[in-house]
Each structure stands twice: as structure tokens, then as C-alpha cells.
Amino acid sequence: MTIFEKKPDFTLFLQTLSWEIDDQVGIEVRNELLREVGRGMGTRIMPPPCQTVDKLQIELNALLALIGWGTVTLELLSEDQSLRIVHENLPQVGSAGEPSGTWLAPVLEGLYGRWVTSQAGAFGDYVVTRDVDAEDLNAVPRQTIIMYMRVRSSAT
């Protein structure tokens, strides 16, 4: 006799939790909480030291594959002193978030912040900004988050 075990599905729980967090504490507090969760996740699984952005991208994609959280493309923009981070296939928590379906995006901000700053010679005091205009205009595939990581003193 074959017994099929259903794996737990946390979708309903996460959707309800996302709505409650947003209602109870508001968007700003929620975003900071999720960034901190991302930093914690980044501490639990860290990339090895990488000498190039290309090698770091390969290592980050290997870590993302472990947790089933999509893929990333990194591009160093030396003229802006920034790192362009394009994350594709972010898991969704239903339609939660702004734009819709991007509730977990602040987790990525914390995650990439931890991972990138763990590298030798990386940004120290940094800020991560999302390109929500591109996300809103559907200029990128659904579940794609575009972020820029800059040294805080040169951020606008």
C-alpha cells in the first residue's frame, strides 16, 4: 500500500499573516520587520567570499535555489557607485504588497544587504531602493523586483 503524505502548505497562513501585520503595524514597520527577517535569513546561509560580481551572482543563485526563491542578476554600475539587483520569481503571498504580489520584497532588501556586505570591499553604510516604477509599468516580468544598492552618502 502506497501512502501519500501531503506536505504542509503555508499559503493561507502567510496571506492572513500578511494582512494582519499590515493592519496592525502599518507598511513602514512591516517593511522594516521584513528587512530584518531578510538580514536574519542572510546570516543563516552566507555566500563564500567572491572576488568578482559574476562569481557572487553564481553563489547567490545557488543559495536562492536552496530555498526556492528565484534567481538574481547583479550588475555593478560604477558611474552611479551602485549595484543593480534584478530578482526574478519572487514567491508571492497572494496579492499582498505594493505593487500587488510584492509583499516579500523587503525581505530581499535585507537578504541582499546582508549577502553583499559580507563580501570583502563591499558597501559599508548602504541603502537599498526599489525601482517600483518599472514594476508598476509591467516593464519587467511578473514577480520581478529591481533594486539598487548604493553607498548611503551618494544615495539620492
Curated annotation (Swiss-Prot):
Keywords: Cellulose biosynthesis
Stretches that traverse the bilayer: none
GO MF term (any one): identical protein binding
Pathway: Glycan metabolism; bacterial cellulose biosynthesis
InterPro entries documented for this protein: BcsD_bac, Cellsynth_D_sf
Domain of life where this protein originates: Bacteria
BP GO annotations: cellulose biosynthetic process
Function of the protein: May have a major role in the perfection of crystallization, involved either in the pore structure itself or in the organization of the pores within the linear array of terminal synthesizing complexes (TCs).
Protein name (database record): Cellulose synthase operon protein D
